Amino acid sequence: GSSYNAIGAMGNAQRWEANQVNPPDYFPLDQHSSTCAEDPYSISKWLGEHIGDAFARRNPQMALASMRFNGMWDDQYFEQLRGDPISDPWTRCQGFWTYVHIRDAARACVVAIADRTWQGHHRFFINAKDTMLAIPTMQALAAVYTDAPLNCELPDFASPISNQHVADIIG
């Protein structure tokens, strides 16, 4: 399995303060985002994805999914979030304020396994289309990731991690 840590999201900072956040190459993040992994856990996720690339080169008919889960929660935690959304953009900035319900994560795994129409190795970000922020995503990005280029404007509370690739490949 993989996670969004394959790009080095959480493991790079000793403490998440303004001068310690390593911004990604661009927003929204996607399957082509490079890594800035420095810690053993993130490096292991990144290496696992490269092993998937190698398997796919040798066996191009195989379907290999690196599922990049982010903030996977159950109903109880969702209720807490609804009651107290994040207003400080530095809170959970290392996870890019995204989340996924455990049922949706499980559904993505089942579909990836059951769907026989795709081949090769794919990196799939598995996350909701919105954030857990009480402020617009663009405002949070401007506060925390001031130097990261934007490939497009993100409306309202849109996730700064694109899940378009997973939608295109497995639905």
Describe each model-derived feature in a short phrase.
Residues E38-S42, N70-G71, D75, W90-R103:
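Glycine-rich "substrate-gating" loop/helix at the edge of Rossmann-like oxidoreductase active sites
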Residues R58-A63, D74-W90, A112-H122:
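Glycine/proline-rich active-site loop of Rossmann-fold NAD(P)-dependent oxidoreductases
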Residues G1-S2, Y26, E38, R68-N70, ...:
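Active-site beta-alpha turn of Rossmann-fold NAD(P)-dependent dehydrogenases/reductases
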Residues N12-Y26, F78-S87, A140-A142:
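Short, flexible, mixed-charge acidic loops at enzyme active sites
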Residues S3-A9, D74, T131:
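Active-site proximal helix/loop that lines the substrate pocket
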Residues A6, G11-N59:
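Catalytic helix-loop patch of NAD(P)-dependent Rossmann-fold dehydrogenases
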Residues A108-N163:
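Mid/C-terminal beta-alpha module of Rossmann-like enzyme folds, strongest
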Residues S2, E49-D74:
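Conserved beta-loop-beta element that borders a ligand/cofactor-binding pocket
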